Curated annotation (Swiss-Prot):
<comment type="similarity">
    <text>Belongs to the anthranilate phosphoribosyltransferase family.</text>
</comment>
<dbReference type="GO" id="GO:0005829">
    <property type="term" value="C:cytosol"/>
</dbReference>
<keyword id="KW-0808">Transferase</keyword>
<dbReference type="GO" id="GO:0004048">
    <property type="term" value="F:anthranilate phosphoribosyltransferase activity"/>
</dbReference>
<feature type="binding site">
    <location>
        <position position="164"/>
    </location>
    <ligand>
        <name>anthranilate 2</name>
    </ligand>
</feature>
<feature type="binding site">
    <location>
        <position position="109"/>
    </location>
    <ligand>
        <name>anthranilate 1</name>
    </ligand>
</feature>
<dbReference type="InterPro" id="IPR005940">
    <property type="entry name" value="Anthranilate_Pribosyl_Tfrase"/>
</dbReference>
<comment type="subunit">
    <text>Homodimer.</text>
</comment>
<feature type="binding site">
    <location>
        <position position="91"/>
    </location>
    <ligand>
        <name>Mg(2+) 1</name>
    </ligand>
</feature>
<dbReference type="GO" id="GO:0000162">
    <property type="term" value="P:L-tryptophan biosynthetic process"/>
</dbReference>
<keyword id="KW-0328">Glycosyltransferase</keyword>
<dbReference type="Pfam" id="PF02885">
    <property type="entry name" value="Glycos_trans_3N"/>
</dbReference>
<feature type="binding site">
    <location>
        <position position="87"/>
    </location>
    <ligand>
        <name>5-phospho-alpha-D-ribose 1-diphosphate</name>
    </ligand>
</feature>
<keyword id="KW-0822">Tryptophan biosynthesis</keyword>
<dbReference type="InterPro" id="IPR035902">
    <property type="entry name" value="Nuc_phospho_transferase"/>
</dbReference>
<protein>
    <recommendedName>
        <fullName>Anthranilate phosphoribosyltransferase</fullName>
        <ecNumber>2.4.2.18</ecNumber>
    </recommendedName>
</protein>
<feature type="binding site">
    <location>
        <begin position="89"/>
        <end position="92"/>
    </location>
    <ligand>
        <name>5-phospho-alpha-D-ribose 1-diphosphate</name>
    </ligand>
</feature>
Amino acid sequence: MNINDILKKLINKSDLEIDEAEELAKAIIRGEVPEILVSAILVALRMKGESKNEIVGFARAMRELAIKIDVPNAIDTAGTGGDGLGTVNVSTASAILLSLINPVAKHGNRAVSGKSGSADVLEALGYNIIVPPERAKELIHKTNFVFLFAQYYHPAMKNVANVRKTLGIRTIFNILGPLTNPANAKYQLMGVFSKDHLDLLSKSAYELDFNKVILVHGEPGIDEVSPIGKTFMKIVSKRGIEEVKFDVTDFGISSIPIDKLIVNSAEDSAIKIVRAFLGKDEHVAEFIKINTAVALFALDKVSNFKEGYEYAKYLIENSVNKLNEIISLNGDLTKLKTIMVKSSG
């Protein structure tokens, strides 16, 4: 493969085939391409607009080069991030609830542009985010929950870290996280930062051997189920791709004020989650329940979103004990107790 020819093709706004994109991604991730050319390729892809085939090819490369673990029937609740609103880490909270009934392989990273990534909030809760594969399998067996830190499970990505940081713009790698779970989670609730990317990412997901994925983008522009209005969804299964639009009031609840969901730090997010689990923050609790409801539908545990919401109400009642179990087996209970104390007021 001639990298310069690939670059010329992208500059001419021609899409790569899946095999071309996969080969290119492997070369980049392995550090075989000079940084100046990596920068040029990432910018050219962004300016052209990443195609489905390019996303699929890059995702396959990242999956192949990742440290892998086997977690049958797992669900992930990862999103693309990048919506810029800084809401509480609802996907992480939902993952904890889901682990009461199903294996959860939560793939995530530290925040890049926001206040708190999934790694940050779990660390604030006392969780040890570096979990080697053998330990990960043990934790799944004992707790139904494991966090797979992207930087640890995709070690070759360090070869592009400097370029990405220097560029300071969204590149194709920013949207690959939810598609590259190291446990090959077959079920997923996937938040998407832009409504315009729902179609592209749903078509990409369809090519990547998921059982069922629900991609969501919610008003007022978040990569979660909307707390205030409409959520635009793509439901991807073996049967194809279905488009759905759903309003928060369809759960039988009122809209949730967005300002009540904003956080300033990982600790702030951790406190809000624990307060919701304790029944002390109704707004955040509702936000967690509506997102969990859609994830339950992705798992085929319920037949509709309203039923999922009712199930989530039961799950959140058992969330504090589950969180304690998760941290006690892989973390620092002292940190969790500190958060609990700060949440009790």
